[in-house]
Amino acid sequence: MICISGIPGTGKSTICNLLNDLGYTCVEGNALAVKYGCLSGDEVDVDCLSDRMRSDNFKGIVAAHYAHLLPCNIVIILEADESALRQRMMDRGYSPEKIDENLDAQRSDTIYAESLERLPANRIFRIRNADLNVALSDILRIIGGRNG
């Protein structure tokens, strides 16, 4: 399974939709959580989701801010410019505290560090999403025709 992760506003959903348009199977993590009954209120139970995906032998690409915590073969971390991220999160109604928390997560490499606990560095990729076409091209090069 290929996992696309990153803080909110980095382009995970947009990339996932573009991959689907190209014939890949990319699913939003929250949709899988609903399908597998792994929601606890508004929160995704990552352990439940991981277990259900393993038992279902899920093959595909998953996009979510927590995707790197799932049973991934490859993790792609999307990153973006802080000013663009701040504006996107403001547009989505995030509180100033939540925006700062998310930006701090990108600055401190939290997702990369958590990914390293699960995978070797040569299976973790960072993509700077400044230009959507370049980011998509980089991702296609990484996944090399694999669909999970």
UniProtKB/Swiss-Prot annotation:
It catalyses: AMP + ATP = 2 ADP; ATP + H2O = ADP + phosphate + H(+). The keyword RNA-binding does not apply. The keyword rRNA processing applies. Residues 28-44 are annotated as: NMP. Residues 91-101 are annotated as: LID. Transmembrane segments: none annotated. Keywords: ATP-binding, Kinase, Nucleotide-binding, Ribosome biogenesis, rRNA processing, Transferase. ATP binds at residues 9, 11-14, 92. Its EC number is 2.7.4.3. GO terms for biological process: ribosomal small subunit biogenesis; rRNA processing. InterPro entries: Adenyl_kinase_AK6, P-loop_NTPase. GO terms for molecular function: adenylate kinase activity; ATP binding; ATP hydrolysis activity. Interacts with uS11. Not a structural component of 40S pre-ribosomes, but transiently interacts with them by binding to uS11. Belongs to the adenylate kinase family. AK6 subfamily. HAMAP family: Adenylate_kinase_AK6. Broad-specificity nucleoside monophosphate (NMP) kinase that catalyzes the reversible transfer of the terminal phosphate group between nucleoside triphosphates and monophosphates. Also has ATPase activity. Involved in the late maturation steps of the 30S ribosomal particles, specifically 16S rRNA maturation. While NMP activity is not required for ribosome maturation, ATPase activity is. Associates transiently with small ribosomal subunit protein uS11. ATP hydrolysis breaks the interaction with uS11. This is Putative adenylate kinase. It comes from Thermoplasma acidophilum (strain ATCC 25905 / DSM 1728 / JCM 9062 / NBRC 15155 / AMRC-C165).
